[in-house]
Amino acid sequence: MEIKVTEIRENKLLGRKEIYFDIIHEGEPTPSREAVKGKLAAMLDLDPNTMVLQYIRSYFGSHVSKGYAKAYETRERMLYIEPEYILLRDGLIQKEEE
C-alpha cells in the first residue's frame, strides 16, 4: 500500500487540516481504515487521536482508492465539531452503555 497526498488545505476557522490522498493498493484489497489512518499520520507527523478519516472510495476495476481525512489541532476541537457517528466509526469515542 502506498499513499500519495494530493492536497492539504489549512482550515483556520475550524482549526484543522483537510487532507486529500490517493491509496495505491495494486494486487491487494482496499486497505482498512486503521491501516490508512496510521500510515497517513506517520507520514505527515500527525497525532492519530486528533485525526478523522472521512472516507475511502474505491472504484471498480481500479487499484487506486481516493480518501479524505481531517486532522484537528486539539482533541477537544475534534469532539466539538465532528458528528458522533464519525467518531464512533473511527474508534475515537466509545458508545455509552445504558
UniProtKB/Swiss-Prot annotation:
GO terms for cellular component: ribonucleoprotein complex; ribosome. InterPro entries: Nucleotide-bd_a/b_plait_sf (IPR012677), Ribosomal_eS24 (IPR001976), Ribosomal_eS24_CS (IPR018098), Ribosomal_uL23/eL15/eS24_sf (IPR012678). GO terms for biological process: translation. One of its GO terms (molecular function) is structural constituent of ribosome. It comes from the Archaea. SUPFAM superfamilies: Ribosomal proteins S24e, L23 and L15e. Keywords: Ribonucleoprotein, Ribosomal protein. Disulfide bonds: none annotated. Coiled coil: none annotated. PANTHER family: 40S RIBOSOMAL PROTEIN S24. Belongs to the eukaryotic ribosomal protein eS24 family. This is Small ribosomal subunit protein eS24. It comes from Thermococcus gammatolerans (strain DSM 15229 / JCM 11827 / EJ3). The lineage of its organism: Archaea, Methanobacteriati, Methanobacteriota, Thermococci, Thermococcales.
